[in-house]
């Protein structure tokens, strides 16, 4: 039996959550080793397990992969979530890169000063509604298909759904002006592997709380 991938990261969303999403969508079971102390990170660094001294790190297929996008590409390619040809791969990559720019605002939000957090929610909403969501609404309206690229599930769909659902936690009506994205979100959420990941008891992490923020500061701050 093949060894399960092992994810090394604190017990929270951060940059590892996209990796969890893609593995889950692919139907791949995985283990996690949560970082809780600076000493655990130091041990990984001293053991030459982290190419650039940073996490996320995923042990998979005899490798220790780092750099979030590289990890996502490897898993997506392995599990046929990265298009059928170069053109599709490039489209998927463009969509993913754009969505990850938006997702990064969500990842960093809990580490802002309290006075700045509400302002940043407004900023995220504005960017989503003006810059990002119109792109995907136009794509879905234009080709009339269920998925963004190639009429099959891809990394682009997974990362977009992750980002939409995370935004809806803060701004429930964020999709009110985007009917195609509303329908798309429901359809992708009901793909069996994704539906299972969205159910209680899965390895999907909850929104970051004060405990997660303190843990991250304790591990990574000098």
Curated annotation (Swiss-Prot):
- List the CDD domains hit by this protein, alphabetically: GST_C_Alpha
Molecular function GO labels: glutathione transferase activity
Q: What is its EC number?
A: 2.5.1.18
Its localization reads:
Cytoplasm
Q: Does the keyword Magnesium apply?
A: no
Keyword Manganese listed? The answer is no
- Pfam families hit by this protein: GST_C_3 (PF14497), GST_N (PF02798)
Which ranges carry the GST N-terminal domain?
Answer: 3-83
Q: How does it assemble?
A: Homodimer.
| Protein name (record) | Glutathione S-transferase A4
Origin species: Bos taurus (Bovine)
């Amino acid at each position: 039996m093949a060894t399960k991938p092992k994810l090394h990261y604190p017990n929270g969303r951060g940059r590892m959550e996209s990796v969890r999403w893609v593995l889950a969508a692919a139907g791949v079971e995985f283990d996690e080793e949560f970082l809780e102390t600076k000493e655990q990170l130091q041990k990984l660094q001293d053991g030459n397990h982290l190419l650039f001294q940073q996490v996320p790190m995923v042990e998979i297929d005899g490798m220790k992969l780092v750099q979030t996008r590289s990890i996502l590409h490897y898993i997506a390619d392995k599990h046929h979530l990265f298009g059928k040809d170069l053109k599709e791969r490039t489209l998927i990559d463009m969509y993913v890169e754009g969505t990850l720019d938006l997702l990064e605002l969500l990842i960093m939000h809990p580490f802002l000063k309290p006075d700045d957090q509400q302002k940043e929610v407004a900023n995220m909403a504005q960017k989503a509604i003006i810059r990002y969501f119109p792109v995907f609404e136009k794509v879905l309206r234009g080709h009339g298909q269920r998925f963004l690229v190639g009429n099959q599930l891809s990394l682009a769909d997974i990362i977009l759904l992750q980002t939409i659902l995370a935004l809806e936690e803060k701004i429930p009506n964020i999709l009110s002006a985007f009917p195609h994205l509303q329908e798309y979100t429901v359809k992708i959420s009901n793909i069996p592997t994704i539906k299972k990941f969205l159910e209680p008891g899965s390895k999907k992490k909850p929104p970051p709380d004060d405990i997660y923020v303190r843990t991250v500061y304790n591990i990574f701050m000098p």
